[in-house]
UniProtKB/Swiss-Prot annotation:
GO terms for cellular component: cytosol; cytosolic large ribosomal subunit. The keyword Ribonucleoprotein applies. SUPFAM superfamilies: Ribosomal protein L13 (SSF52161). This is Large ribosomal subunit protein uL13x.
Length: 206
């Protein structure tokens, strides 16, 4: 990613699983403003500190905030985990300026890991990981679970799709492991067959 690491890939795919919501959002906002394209997947597994009941009460208070004369004017209350995360990032960006709007346009958010991002190497942000930032024994809840409690209807669907994706990934991993094993065996056989010829080739090999 741009800041700190000195690496600037065209697009960075971040796995949101077990990252703290606010810390992940602030790191993402900083990278977006620096010109980085960021894709965040598995938003339903982002963590919030505090138990589910407490977080649900806070969200229900937020749902009561509306414009009395015309509620459709706002504020808009998102239920999907990806949109909740997107709104959190938006609050950390000056999105009403051209620079902020351009930064927000560089962000993509998804529940689960849809193609083609299931074939791309995914990153984590250590500064935002639950295991490093939350004390052991501290209560937390998942954003997907909270969303399903306040009106998001696709929690089970995403769970089912993720199970299928993991099964496909496991099959591909086993196949790759088998191919690597066969390649190692073939190289060993070739070395035994060539024998002394390898000593002649050694000085000119890369």
């Amino acid at each position: 990613m741009v800041s700190g690491s000195g690496i600037c890939a065209k697009r960075v795919v971040v796995d949101g699983r077990h990252h703290m919501l606010g810390r992940l959002a602030s790191n993402t906002a900083k990278e977006l403003l620096n010109g980085q394209e960021v894709v965040v997947v598995r938003c339903e597994e982002i963590c919030l500190s505090g138990g589910l009941v407490r977080q649900k009460m806070k969200y229900m208070r937020f749902l009561r905030k509306r414009m009395n004369t015309k509620p459709s004017h706002g504020p808009i209350h998102f239920r999907a985990p990806s949109k909740i995360f997107w709104r959190t990032v938006r609050g950390m960006i000056p999105h009403k300026t051209k620079r902020g709007a351009a930064a927000l346009a560089r962000l993509k958010v998804f529940e689960g890991i849809p193609p083609p991002y299931d074939k791309i190497k995914r990153m984590v942000i250590p500064d935002a990981l639950k295991v490093l930032r939350l004390q052991s024994g501290h209560k937390y809840c998942l954003l997907g679970r909270l969303s399903s409690e306040v009106g998001w209807n696709h929690y089970d669907t995403i769970k089912e799709l993720e199970t299928k994706r993991k099964e496909r990934s496991q099959v591909m991993y086993e196949r790759k492991k088998q191919l690597n094993k066969l390649r190692t065996k073939a190289e060993k056989v070739a070395e035994e067959r060539l024998g002394s010829q390898l000593d002649v080739l050694a000085p000119v090999k890369y």
